[in-house]
């Protein structure tokens, strides 16, 4: 990790301020180099490209000093940035061990440095797309399952690095509420069966836009989604900004969705968490 920090110039950035570094072990770095077919770290950097290599390394660093006791499960901003220069987030799950993006586990915690804390990792932690940031959060497993079962290969769509998205993501409880309100439906799979996979695709796309929409730029008004209105256009929802940010869908039978945690940044856009499933009918 020390060599990688020097190669990217991040060692200079870490010399001023307090930081938390999730550091893959030397064995992890060696396995990474070998798995990708390179001779050494220099060859890996050249093969990936300087910017991508730096982004991966910076994705292991948080600003501020955080011991393992300081963490709770949630999204954390890293020092990596995407093409829009927004700081990327990772998802940390705090259980018996700390897990980053459901893959990289902390195997030795709380190594105290002069200007922060180091936590040792058992694997490389890669930046995630807007889909990837939902995929790794167990509180959004219903949305993740719906994306996987819908027509149109939405997983690949929302992971596409050549595109930009904003995803308004309802949590599991929101899907549970929709299940309860849908006649003759008892669980998520029955809900999906009642909708059909084509309608499910449009339902998911009603929660996404094809542009970067950070909370600082949200205004009261209509927003075009990626959902098809059946006439060659796109369905819209309405944002109402007051004491809360509310999203009003096209159904009279559902409650407004309230915007919760916002500006969770992925490699290809942003995620905002909401508390209701939006219906575009």
Language-model features: locations:
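Mature, structured domains of secreted/extracytosolic soluble proteins
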Residues: 1-281
């Amino acid at each position: 990790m020390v060599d990688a920090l020097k190669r990217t110039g991040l060692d200079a950035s870490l010399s001023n301020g307090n930081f938390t570094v999730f550091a893959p072990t030397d064995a992890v770095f060696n396995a990474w180099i070998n798995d990708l077919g390179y001779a050494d770290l220099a060859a890996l950097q050249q093969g990936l490209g300087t910017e991508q290599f730096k982004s991966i390394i910076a994705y292991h660093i948080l600003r501020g000093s955080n011991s393992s006791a300081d963490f709770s499960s949630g999204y954390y901003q890293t020092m990596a940035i995407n093409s829009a220069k927004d700081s990327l987030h990772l998802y940390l799950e705090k259980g018996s061990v700390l897990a980053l993006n459901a893959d990289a586990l902390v195997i030795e915690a709380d190594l105290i440095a002069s200007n922060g804390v180091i936590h040792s990792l058992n694997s490389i932690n890669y930046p995630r797309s807007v889909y990837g940031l939902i995929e790794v959060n167990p509180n959004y497993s219903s949305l993740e399952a719906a994306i996987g079962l819908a027509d149109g290969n939405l997983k690949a769509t929302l992971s596409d690095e050549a595109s930009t998205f904003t995803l308004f993501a309802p949590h599991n409880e929101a899907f549970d509420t929709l299940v309860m309100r849908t006649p003759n439906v008892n669980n998520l799979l029955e809900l999906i069966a009642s909708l059909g996979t084509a309608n499910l695709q449009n339902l998911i796309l009603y929660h996404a836009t094809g542009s970067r929409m950070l909370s600082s730029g949200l205004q009261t008004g209509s927003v075009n989604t990626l959902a098809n209105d059946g006439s060659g256009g796109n369905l819209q929802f309405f944002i109402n900004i007051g004491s809360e940010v509310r999203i009003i869908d096209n159904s009279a039978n559902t409650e407004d969705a309230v915007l919760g945690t916002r500006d969770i940044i992925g490699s290809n856009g942003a995620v905002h968490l909401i508390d209701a499933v939006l219906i575009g009918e």
